[in-house]
């Protein structure tokens, strides 16, 4: 493949594509802007990002994370992008979260020291088919419907539903080959073609 052919191929990448997302996620500013929008927290700070982190498991399946962000409040946030709808996505999120949690634990840790983790799962389809751009999946006590805080937040976002919200507008940018939106300056600076 010639250099010109490679340049043409790169022009077709969109933020939802794994290869391009890896490049975007390497920019702390892009990750911070994205998470502030998705998690609806204007004060959220991303201190560090580890892109394509391989979490090894000597006894079974390992996992490769798209982006693992370390937040200013000490929480970790795993961001995954998924185009294919040929998987059990809830179990994938559960598996990834468990691997990250185990990898971050020490032999003598008390369970109260278990990390707080957010998993943001961005998909090119509406995983729950309920017509929402964002879903928060919580642990609840079935009998009382009370939410239980076990330190894991699961947030599913998609690029399909267009509901007029800022999150929906941002997710629509993930489908574009070129982004030019003043509301999202960090993403625009990385994806805009001059």
Language-model features: locations:
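Elongated, amphipathic alpha-helical interaction scaffolds
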Residues: 1-194
